[in-house]
Regions:
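Charge-dense, helix-prone N-terminal extensions
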Residues: 1-126
Length: 126
């Protein structure tokens, strides 16, 4: 099985198209959650379940939705925010990288993905 790079402290999503191979790898890890699908957007992919976007792929990095209910968990796991260059300054989105060591094992990734889906559903209600 191919080993994918873990998120780095630099921002690898800047000016980097996402690979369909990595997208397929992510979808296979998330398959136990149910009907998860990917939609191309801005050179990467949005990851959806029941029309709720709970993750995104930028470059070859998976970012998961965060809110006040799970942000500290992601920070404590060493995850970093998804950022992009805005017109005047970098903009931080409410998505954090999947914690190190989760991208090769669905059992390790799924609790984080389920937390992200719950955060996305809470955000959609508001």
């Amino acid at each position: 099985m191919r080993r994918y790079p873990q998120p780095r402290q630099t921002n690898p999503n800047r000016n980097m198209a996402s690979s369909t191979e990595f997208r397929d790898h992510v979808l296979s890890l998330l398959l136990p959650m149910g009907p998860v699908r990917a939609r191309g957007m801005f050179g990467g992919f949005g990851i959806f379940m029941d029309d709720v976007m709970f993750a995104l792929i930028a470059g070859d990095t998976l970012f998961l939705k965060i809110d006040s209910g799970n942000k500290d968990d992601f920070r404590n796991a060493g995850s970093r925010p998804f950022t992009y260059e805005g017109k005047k300054r970098p903009v931080e989105m409410s998505y954090y990288s999947a914690p190190e060591g989760t991208m090769e094992d669905a059992a390790k990734l799924l609790p984080w993905a389920e937390s992200a889906l719950a955060a996305a559903k809470r955000a959609k209600k508001n």
